[in-house]
């Protein structure tokens, strides 16, 4: 059973099962993103299929029109799906790995005067959220929202997700200097207008950021900082399965829906506390 893997299980009425050791009842949806949902599984499968087949992202308004549900329900369904996409954002990268950080948020100059953030320039952007990404050439990508783009927040994530025998490529941002102690580290100097030097470049990870930001601008319009990691998960999953056929991507996702349940209360409380 999902409550005790050593327990016997009894089949009960109404497609339910009972765990002998804990006495708890469960069904095939328990512990998955479908647990206690009032939306039909047919609509869930349609929503997941649409997410898997839309290369540039799927908005809650479009899903609302397709399923005939409220925008709130469509948004919550998509957030559950995006959280589940995080199962493919845990890879350990080897061989040649590019890494780069980016900032997500609107341009300060475009804000109304009473909403502009003072002293917000360059890397001191107080109004933007830093996101750190690593991509293995001809392999997978890992990306996560970070508190800051400093060494104390970036280096531990590199050590966690990049094999110590890998060769890493970065730009000249000072937070990466600590990588020299562990990795074979090469730097491309963008401030000198150097973008490619043989195999030394960060073009793949920058391409990933470009696709991600175009989706935010063109599909989602506005993404709250508190939920940004869910959107990052979605695009990491898209990139890591870019060579999959849509049906294969759908099945790969469905094989990993266990353990990623998200309650609406948790989603809202997380936003309030962040």
Where would I find each of the regions flagged by the language model?
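Residue-level recognition of single "structural anchor" positions
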Residues: 1-274
């Amino acid at each position: 059973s999902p409550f005790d893997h050593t327990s016997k299980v009894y089949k009960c009425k109404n497609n339910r099962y009972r765990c002998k050791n804990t006495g708890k009842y469960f069904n095939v949806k328990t512990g998955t993103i479908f647990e206690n949902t009032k939306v039909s599984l047919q609509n869930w499968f349609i929503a997941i299929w649409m997410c898997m087949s839309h290369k540039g992202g799927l908005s809650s308004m479009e899903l609302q029109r397709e399923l005939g549900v409220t925008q709130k329900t469509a948004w919550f369904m998509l957030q559950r799906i995006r959280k589940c996409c995080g199962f493919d954002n845990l890879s350990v990268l080897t061989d040649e790995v590019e890494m780069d950080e980016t900032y997500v948020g609107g341009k300060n100059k475009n804000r109304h005067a009473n909403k502009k953030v003072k002293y917000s320039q360059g890397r001191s952007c107080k109004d933007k959220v830093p996101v750190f990404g690593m991509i293995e050439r001809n392999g997978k990508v890992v990306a996560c929202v970070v508190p800051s783009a400093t060494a104390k927040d970036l280096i531990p994530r590199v050590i966690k997700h990049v094999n110590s025998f890998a060769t890493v490529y970065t730009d000249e941002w000072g937070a990466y200097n600590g990588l020299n102690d562990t990795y074979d580290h090469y730097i491309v100097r963008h401030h000198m207008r150097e973008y490619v030097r043989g195999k030394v470049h960060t073009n793949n990870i920058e391409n990933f950021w470009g696709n991600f930001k175009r989706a935010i601008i063109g599909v989602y319009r506005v993404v709250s900082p508190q939920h940004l990691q869910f959107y990052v998960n979605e695009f990491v999953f898209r990139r890591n399965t870019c060579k999959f056929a849509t049906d294969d991507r759908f099945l790969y996702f469905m094989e990993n829906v266990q353990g990623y349940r998200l309650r609406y209360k948790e989603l809202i409380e997380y936003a309030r506390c962040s």
